[in-house]
């Protein structure tokens, strides 16, 4: 009843699909794979899942199966995408059932892998994450009626790493102290129990708890040195806050990001201009680039020091893996003066840098000045929206600036409250 009477499966040639009775799934654990060809994360995940599924097929064929639930926009996209998959599929024409399944399992974001027991009970809605963390082991444990991930109640003062799993015991969310490797190619995360049991090829560091205030020495403990802009010359990390520095800006950006490439030269010009009048303010670059060549080419365009590419993981996690470009301003004691440094610079220009150079906060922006980072007006296309923002709940991802709101809209609009300094937009 959940999936209807018939599903699709590839015939022996693999070039076409035949219809089969849904009854063939009786007694099996079934994973519903919500995915779409237009979605890059889906196109990245599907071949990995397909490879694991094929490897496990002989062992699990009587216990486990996957059904593709398409979020594609047309039949031809569905047909093309389904050819990459070795499992069954809900017919594309059954759009009503897609809507029902999507609502029932709250599958709003793709890819999603919802694993159901033979009786239809949900085993896990974190199938994608479990496969990413444990590969074939996830598929092997689901037919036992178990989710790979588990957790426990946090004790007083323990931090909950909501979207992180221990790569040894699979505790997710990971509770308490978290250790990991700063190398980009390593995704290891260890809880305090598994840390002593692990022999990792690279040194491990302890992650810092977001929103807790640390000294600059503690924040940069995992950074062995800083790089000068146009060379491989190394500078001691502590020089960043020495010589009466009142505040530092941590600048997250990447060469592949076009808003970053627009923001960086403007910020660099202001920074060079401010060095005489605001010597108490410094910036350090934390790269979100994916390779050394891009990293080195991009930092050469900047007049400030840089954190090495393989020493940035702790800072990124402390600031919640920020959208880029982002500029966080910290005072000399490690407290945050601004989480919105980039909009502050857009609003106040060099005065922002001078204020931070005195170790002071900028006054909060007036409603008509507030910049809604990464929000575009769907009326006049202002990007980002500056001033009051209105949202249409009926349309979903639909926002208007104050000028366009006055022109009217077919559905009711809600004024979005201006976030405080520590609030998320």
Protein language model regions, located:
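Non-catalytic, surface beta->alpha helical segment in thiol-disulfide oxidoreductase systems
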Residues: 92, 104-148, 321-361
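Cys/His-rich, Zn2+-coordinating zinc-finger modules
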Residues: 189-214, 387, 399-425
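Short cysteine-rich clusters marking metal-coordination/redox-active sites
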Residues: 166-169, 181-183, 191, 377-380, ...
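Canonical RING-type zinc finger of E3 ubiquitin-protein ligases
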Residues: 173-184, 384-395
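Structural microenvironment flanking redox-active thiols in thiol-disulfide oxidoreductases
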Residues: 46-81, 97-98, 264-298, 314-315
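Thioredoxin-like thiol-disulfide oxidoreductase module
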Residues: 71-111, 119, 288-323
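A short beta-strand-turn-helix
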Residues: 2-30, 221-248
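Conserved redox-active cysteine motifs that mediate thiol-disulfide chemistry
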Residues: 28, 34-54, 252-269
């Amino acid at each position: 009843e959940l999936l209807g009477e018939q599903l699709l499966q590839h015939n022996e040639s693999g070039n076409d699909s035949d219809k089969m009775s849904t009854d063939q799934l009786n007694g099996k654990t079934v994973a519903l794979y919500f995915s779409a060809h237009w979605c890059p994360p889906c196109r990245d995940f599907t071949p990995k899942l397909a490879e694991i599924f094929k490897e496990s097929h002989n062992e699990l064929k009587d216990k486990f199966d996957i059904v593709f639930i398409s979020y594609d926009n047309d039949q031809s996209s569905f047909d093309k995408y389904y050819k990459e998959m070795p499992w069954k599929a809900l017919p594309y024409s059954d759009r009503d059932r897609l809507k029902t399944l999507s609502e029932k399992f709250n599958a709003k974001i793709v890819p999603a892998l919802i694993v159901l027991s033979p009786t239809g009970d949900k085993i896990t809605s974190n199938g994608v994450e479990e496969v990413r963390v444990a590969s074939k082991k996830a598929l092997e444990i689901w037919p036992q009626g178990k989710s790979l991930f588990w957790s426990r109640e946090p004790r007083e003062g323990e931090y909950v790493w909501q979207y992180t799993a221990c790569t040894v015991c699979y505790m997710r969310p990971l509770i308490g102290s978290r250790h990991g490797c700063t190398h980009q190619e390593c995704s290891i995360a260890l809880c305090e129990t598994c840390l002593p049991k692990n022999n990792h090829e690279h040194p491990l560091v302890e992650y810092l708890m977001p929103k807790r205030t640390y000294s600059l020495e503690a924040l940069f403990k995992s950074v062995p040195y800083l790089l000068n802009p146009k060379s491989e010359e190394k500078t001691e990390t502590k020089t960043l806050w020495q010589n009466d520095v009142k505040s530092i800006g941590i600048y997250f950006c990447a060469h592949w990001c076009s808003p970053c490439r627009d923001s960086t030269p403007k910020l660099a010009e202001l920074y060079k201009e401010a060095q005489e009048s605001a010597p108490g303010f410094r910036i350090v670059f934390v790269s979100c680039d994916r390779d050394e060549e891009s990293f080195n080419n991009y930092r050469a365009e900047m007049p400030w020091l840089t954190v090495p590419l393989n020493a940035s993981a702790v800072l990124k996690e402390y600031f919640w893996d920020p959208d880029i470009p982002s500029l966080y301003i910290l005072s000399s004691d490690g407290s945050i003066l601004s989480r919105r440094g980039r909009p502050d610079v857009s609003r106040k220009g060099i005065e922002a840098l001078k204020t931070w150079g005195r170790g002071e906060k900028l006054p909060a922006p007036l409603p008509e000045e507030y910049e809604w980072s990464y929000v575009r007006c769907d009326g006049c296309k202002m990007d980002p929206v500056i001033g009051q923002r209105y949202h249409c709940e009926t349309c979903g991802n639909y926002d208007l600036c104050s000028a366009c709101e006055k022109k009217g809209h077919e559905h009711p609009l809600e004024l979005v409250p201006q976030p405080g300094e520590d609030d998320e937009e």
